[in-house]
Each structure stands twice: as C-alpha cells, then as structure tokens.
Design a protein with these regions (language model features):
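Generic beta-sheet signal
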Residues: 44-46, 123
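Conserved acetyl-CoA-binding loop of GNAT-fold acetyltransferases
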Residues: 65
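Class I SAM-dependent methyltransferase "Motif I" SAM/SAH-binding loop
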Residues: 47-54, 130
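Gly/Ala-rich phosphate-binding loop of Rossmann-like dinucleotide-binding domains
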Residues: 61-62
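Class I (Rossmann-like) S-adenosyl-L-methionine-dependent methyltransferase catalytic domain
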Residues: 1-44, 53-57, 69-104, 108-118, ...
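A short SAM/SAH-binding and catalytic strip from SAM-dependent methyltransferases
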Residues: 111-113, 123-138
Length: 217
C-alpha cells in the first residue's frame, strides 16, 4: 500500500471523503449484514476495512454490533475515538497498534499484514472505503486477502461508478463488472441499488452509487 499518501491526507486534514453522519445507504441496507443467520453467535461482529474515522462505526455500535476495523492512519483513529467520546486502551503489537474500547477494536497498521486470528471471527464485512480507495493493481490482492482473513464472511459493499478519465481518484470507480471479477468465484453477488450520486463525486464528476450484498457460495 502507498502508506505516505494516506498519512499525508490525514495530517493535512484533506478528508473530503469523510461524511459527518452515518451513511444513508448503510442504514438502508444494513439488514443484509445484521440479519444474516450465524450458527456461532447471535452477536453481530462487523469488520470495517480501511475504516478511517467514519461515523458509520458509531451507527453500527448503536445497533448493538461489535466492530473491528483496520486503518493505516493513527491520526484517523485518534480522531475517531475522540469523536465517539471514548478513551481507548492502546496496545502496541508487532504489526502496529490496537485501539480498543467497549465493543470497538481498531488495528492501526497495514491491513495486508493482518490475519484471521488478529481480527477474530466476524459475521460480516462493511466495505464503503476500501475497494474504492485502492488502485486497480491492489484490488485483486485486497479481495483475496479479505476473503481469507474474514473466512468469506458476508459483505455489504458501497462503491462509485464514474468516468475515470474525468477524475483520477481516489476514490476510484469500481463498477459491477469489477466486483464480479473480484468476488464471483467465492460469493453470490446481488446488486441492491444503483442510483445517481447527488451533486456528483466531490462536486467534480457525475457518478452513481452502487450497493452490493455478497453471500458465500
């Protein structure tokens, strides 16, 4: 991963992609994650890759979920806990640091170094910021790694589709064909929504929202 890019974004507070409230599409389609039958536990434990300081985490916690996140930028995670009003326990590890408090655990470091034992059992994956943050060469590696460390847990993916020639990204355009190519060997994929992104992406380019539910085959 290009570590310096994301560290710089957070240090300079250049985080226009960060929404002040929980994402409306998460709230609309959360049942695809939270209503999944799980024989191991009634508790919903959701993995949020490349989570940043998204307030979606607070919303998931408010629904009674435990949340496990992975994020490269420690600045983002410090801000996340401050905004949640929570004082985390911070544990250094060989792979970075773990911030934890009241059902929320964030692994600060390179997501590609995490294993299934690091994150523990999860009942679902919420990906609103990972696929669209990664350039094309890294997406295949990311998808394969995510399948491994989450043991093919169900996913809710929110992405954008737009003309990549009009804006370089990130966030990058990730269309339905790309999601199918990355995940169709392991998951049944259902597109839940395609809708126009009001105001465009960052106000610069026309774009559509795409929402997918993935269930293991």
């Amino acid at each position: 991963m290009e570590h310096s890019f994301w560290h710089s974004k957070w240090q300079k507070n250049e985080i226009g992609f960060h929404e002040p409230e929980g994402n409306a599409l998460l709230i609309k389609y959360a049942s695809s994650l939270l209503d999944v039958e799980n024989s191991h536990s009634a508790l919903k434990r959701i993995f949020v890759p490349l989570c940043g300081k998204t307030r979606d985490i607070g919303w998931l916690l408010s629904q009674g979920c435990e949340v496990v996140g992975a994020e490269l930028s420690e600045v983002a995670i410090i801000q996340l806990f401050e905004e949640l009003g929570a004082e985390p326990t911070i544990t250094p590890t060989a792979k970075g640091k773990v911030y934890a408090k009241d059902g929320l655990t964030i692994h600060v470091g390179d997501i590609f170094k995490l294993t299934s034992s690091d994150i523990g059992d999860v009942t679902g994956v919420y990906d609103r910021a990972a696929l669209v943050a990664l350039p094309s060469p890294l997406r295949e590696q990311y998808a394969a790694h995510l399948i491994t460390i989450t043991q093919c847990a169900p996913q809710l993916i929110i992405s954008f589709e737009y003309d990549q020639n009009e804006m370089a990204g990130p966030p990058f355009s990730v269309n339905e064909k790309t999601v199918d190519a990355l995940y169709s060997a392991d998951y049944n994929i259902q597109r839940l929504e395609r809708s126009v992104l009001e105001g465009g992406l960052k106000g610069k380019v026309d774009a559509d929202n795409l929402v997918f539910a993935l269930k293991a085959k």
